[in-house]
């Protein structure tokens, strides 16, 4: 079995780790960074960029740059670029392809399997979408695990004593809180809660809205209609937020942000930490409600929590740390890297699956209740939230009308009393039920949640033994045909990326060869015959001409021809030098040492 990597597929940044020698190691990307921006872009000539290079060009190419795609996972949203539309799964797969390629370069071997993390509060459709993204990227996703649980694995791998820990995970786009009991290699999740629409992006947006408002009041211009200005504001807001974690005042200076009839306009604003905290106070408070709910579900009080782990870049915000400190009456633990611990935990889980990590048992839970719609639109729960997974539960239902021969099973996920207020995961029909008075037929509905948190449902007529099975595939998930098409598209992009890389390397080699040849011509000077010099210069010119085009093979051929000509001349000079050194006539001519060398050079010239 090859290496199985652990991936934290984040809203803002992603990270990958692997087990090496029994220890989890973060894999740096091709740019040398330990995290990769979760950004995808398409240039005007449709070249695909992923990661740091995509983020760098976002200001000049905002309409073709895709950020925070994780927030759209499990939805039917599409990203339209020119005449092609991409699903969130396909965009996520592009990020995963980059991560996969970087891991392969680091490990020196093909990588085909991974453990990928998701927010604990992700629904079934969001989890399935993540699995599909992995498949499109050429990865078999062995396990989907919850981000807070992964962070707990990273923290507790070497801990001996029993502890109750709370993981407070505030990332770029999502918020989770999980409470676990750990000890003797067992990691048991007691409760989890969260908010899939709360994260660092929302804190950035408050600064952006504030700057737009100030600028409008001062200049009467609405920057929100200018996409390039908005991208500059987004980057400046993120930078200001990060800076305010370390200082109490920062300056946001964006010259030439826009222009009107009177000329260019500049934005120059001083933002204090106090003002930032005022703008985002309600966002910080929003993290407290899921925290209270998780504590309530676990049956614990704040004083019973031994450690609070801060996970996700947004937990560096001082107001967030202060809110946690105030709520629990103790300092949160800061001994783990909030950007890397989730990927490290995923790598540990990968190690468990491959047998590299022994004596570790992970017991996770389902974040939301699961059930079906029953008479009157009521949501009847079969599996309560925070039930340990994998799990299986059955319940007997019956028909609602006399002579009813079919029942439609509509599967929902959520906590509301009425089915319509929860998320519909999918539906299927069990037909062929023998006609009978209402309430007589016995229909057994079984819910089965696997270790990935993905739901399988079956309905069985106990009278006839007829059964229907489905793995939930909501309308937002991709069909098998769509996945296959996306896999082929991804392979095509991979091939294009390979060709682009080959082209760049070929051009670099050609440039390098031309430089080397020209330098050697200059260094050799008169030692080179005019015939050989002309030959090399002609080959250099052929390479230059080839470089003007885009034919990689032509550039390769011209470079190889120059290389051969260069080697041929070099060998000739070397042989002539040896022959001249061995000529005894040079020793018996007499005269001074200088004359001997003159004679040698003349001999070389004569031979040519």
Curated annotation (Swiss-Prot):
Pfam families found in the cross-reference section: HSP70
Listed Low complexity bias regions: 577-590
Highest taxon above the source species: Bacteria
GO molecular function list: ATP binding; ATP-dependent protein folding chaperone; unfolded protein binding
Induction: By stress conditions e.g. heat shock.
Residue stretches of biased makeup (Basic and acidic residues): 493-505, 599-608
CDD domains in the record: ASKHA_NBD_HSP70_DnaK-like
Signal peptide per UniProt: none
Keywords recorded for this protein, A-Z: ATP-binding, Chaperone, Nucleotide-binding, Phosphoprotein, Stress response
UniProt xrefs under InterPro entries: ATPase_NBD (IPR043129), Chaperone_DnaK (IPR012725), Heat_shock_70_CS (IPR018181), HSP70_C_sf (IPR029048), HSP70_peptide-bd_sf (IPR029047), Hsp_70_fam (IPR013126)
Phosphothreonine modified-residue sites: 174
Region listing for Disordered, in residue ranges: 493-514, 577-608
Protein role: Acts as a chaperone.
PANTHER family per the UniProt record, alphabetical: HEAT SHOCK PROTEIN 70KDA
HAMAP family: DnaK
Similarity field: Belongs to the heat shock protein 70 family.
Record protein name field: Chaperone protein DnaK
